[in-house]
């Protein structure tokens, strides 16, 4: 006689909404929280209507970001009544409670465990007795150094890899050390295993991020850790060399111009990592840099010249602040002169505004808003001209382009028009390449790396046609069929 077993009743998983605001470093924190939610059996709701509670990962750096975060918290409260606030603004709970006293819980940044404790309290989950959960992290690993496959908030073909948290600088306009603490680096082995897993899953481009990437490992006294049976030092040079051996595009962000960065540029000249440096210069006037409490006054041009001698293909991006307190017309002219001489490839700028709790708020010499805007316009006029001239030099060349999206017109065969980026363009902040697929229409997929002939350019973008679709072969065994192109 055969006994049939009645099916066990299923329990619907609690649904949690999620809002991620701020920079790529905050995005990585969001990915870690979402990974833990999934690992513990929670479902991520696509909208407020389906959510039983909402997590808001906030930004608290500049005033507009604070206001955006507070507005998002309010919307989530109106929709669900249960909101957990985390991230940078969470380091200032009084700011949140003043506007939204009914939030369920507040944590700071890098607080996955705290966030999950509050989620469990708000939405207790009944685990299936026949299903076990493996830990996302192992004993001795830093929070966020995951073993399990993680949730990504970027397309499959690129990812942000955060190598350190916090900052040791005391820039007068910045409150990051107050929000995120002093620098805490991850062991090199943890970073490399994460990169290895990402590439094995089909990721072709890694953006290496932190507040001060050049200082990676200083707090660890550059100790070694294990990666595939080898001891690797927690130093940017060693890390970059190992990452470069994996065969993906490796892009360096937030690189301060310390002397050892020349070794990184040498790796770029050898083709091991992308010839791209995101360098936060902020200004060129020694007087303004001193008031900002920033390094590099008087040495920036010499450093850039040396880098370009080592790697002529190097693309340099930087960001500047215009209208800092005490900035004279002479100071601003020094900045314009620097821009003309340095001929940076990618430039961003914004006008100075007070940041709550920043030391710069107490500086005298506030610049009128109309003067700030006038200087910003002059700055961007120079920057756009230089960008237009530098991009025009690429016309006629064949460049590698990673495809981010389709851009088909109505009536086009699918995959006829593509948008991608060169090795000199990071997603979201730099230029794009608009391509006609030609004979390769319908064959190129998002995430493919193609070769394209550049036919035209403007201030920020390039235009061209696909001429070849080589197969992508990293030095990491791929999971599944991710190797085509």
UniProtKB/Swiss-Prot annotation:
Positions contributing to [4Fe-4S] cluster 2 binding? 167, 171, 174
GO terms, biological process: tRNA modification
Domain TRAM span(s) in chain numbering: 392-468
* UniProt entry keywords in alphabetical sequence: 4Fe-4S, Cytoplasm, Iron, Iron-sulfur, Metal-binding, S-adenosyl-L-methionine, Transferase
Q: Does the keyword Lipoprotein apply?
A: no
Binding annotation for [4Fe-4S] cluster 1: 23, 59, 88
Q: State the reactions this protein catalyses.
A: L-aspartate(89)-[ribosomal protein uS12]-hydrogen + (sulfur carrier)-SH + AH2 + 2 S-adenosyl-L-methionine = 3-methylsulfanyl-L-aspartate(89)-[ribosomal protein uS12]-hydrogen + (sulfur carrier)-H + 5'-deoxyadenosine + L-methionine + A + S-adenosyl-L-homocysteine + 2 H(+)
Give its localization.
Answer: Cytoplasm
Q: What is the name attached to this protein's record?
A: Ribosomal protein uS12 methylthiotransferase RimO
The organism that produces this protein has a lineage beginning with: Bacteria, Thermotogati, Deinococcota, Deinococci, Deinococcales
């Amino acid at each position: 006689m055969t006994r049939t077993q009645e099916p066990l009743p299923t329990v619907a998983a609690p649904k949690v909404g999620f809002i991620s605001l701020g920079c790529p470093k905050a995005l990585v924190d969001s990915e870690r929280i979402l990974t833990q939610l999934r690992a513990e059996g929670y479902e991520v709701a696509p909208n407020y209507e389906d959510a039983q509670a909402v997590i808001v990962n906030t930004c608290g750096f500049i005033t507009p970001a604070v206001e955006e975060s507070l507005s998002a918290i309010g919307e989530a409260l109106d929709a669900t009544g249960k909101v957990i606030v985390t991230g940078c603004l969470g380091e200032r709970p009084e700011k949140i409670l003043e506007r939204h006293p009914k939030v369920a819980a507040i944590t700071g940044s890098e607080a996955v465990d705290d966030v999950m404790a509050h989620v469990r309290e708000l939405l207790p989950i009944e685990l299936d007795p026949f299903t076990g959960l493996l830990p996302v992290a192992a004993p001795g690993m830093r929070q966020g150094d995951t073993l399990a496959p993680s949730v990504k908030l970027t397309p499959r073909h690129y990812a942000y890899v955060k190598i350190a948290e916090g900052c040791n600088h005391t820039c007068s306009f910045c409150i990051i050390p107050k929000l995120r603490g002093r620098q805490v680096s991850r062991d090199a082995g943890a970073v490399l295993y994460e990169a290895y897993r990402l590439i094995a899953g089909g990721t072709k481009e890694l953006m290496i991020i932190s507040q001060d990437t050049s200082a990676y490992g200083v707090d660890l006294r550059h100790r070694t850790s294990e990666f595939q049976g080898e001891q690797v030092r927690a130093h940017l040079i060693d890390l970059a060399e190992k990452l470069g051996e994996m065969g993906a595009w490796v892009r360096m962000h937030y690189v301060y111009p310390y002397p050892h960065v020349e070794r990184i540029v040498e790796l770029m000249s050898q083709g091991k990592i992308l010839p791209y440096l995101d360098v936060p210069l902020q200004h060129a006037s020694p007087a303004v840099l001193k008031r900002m409490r920033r390094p590099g006054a008087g040495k920036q041009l010499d450093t850039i010249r040396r880098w370009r001698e080592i790697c002529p293909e190097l693309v340099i991006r930087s960001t500047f602040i215009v209208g800092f307190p005490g900035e004279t017309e002479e100071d601003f002219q020094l900045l314009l002169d620097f821009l003309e001489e340095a001929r940076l490839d990618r430039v961003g700028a914004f006008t100075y505004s007070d940041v709550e709790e920043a030391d710069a708020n107490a500086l005298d010499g506030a610049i009128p808003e109309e003067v700030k805007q006038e200087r910003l316009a002059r700055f961007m006029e120079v920057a756009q001209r230089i960008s237009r001239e530098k991009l025009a030099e690429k016309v006629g060349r064949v460049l590698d382009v990673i495809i981010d999206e389709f851009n088909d017109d109505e009536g086009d065969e699918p995959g006829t028009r593509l948008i991608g980026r060169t090795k000199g363009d990071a997603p979201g902040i730099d230029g794009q390449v608009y391509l006609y697929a030609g004979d390769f229409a319908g064959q190129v997929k998002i995430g493919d790396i193609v070769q394209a002939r550049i036919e035209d350019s403007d201030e920020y973008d390039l235009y061209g046609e696909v001429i070849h679709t080589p197969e992508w072969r990293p030095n990491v065994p791929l999971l599944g069929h991710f190797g085509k192109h």
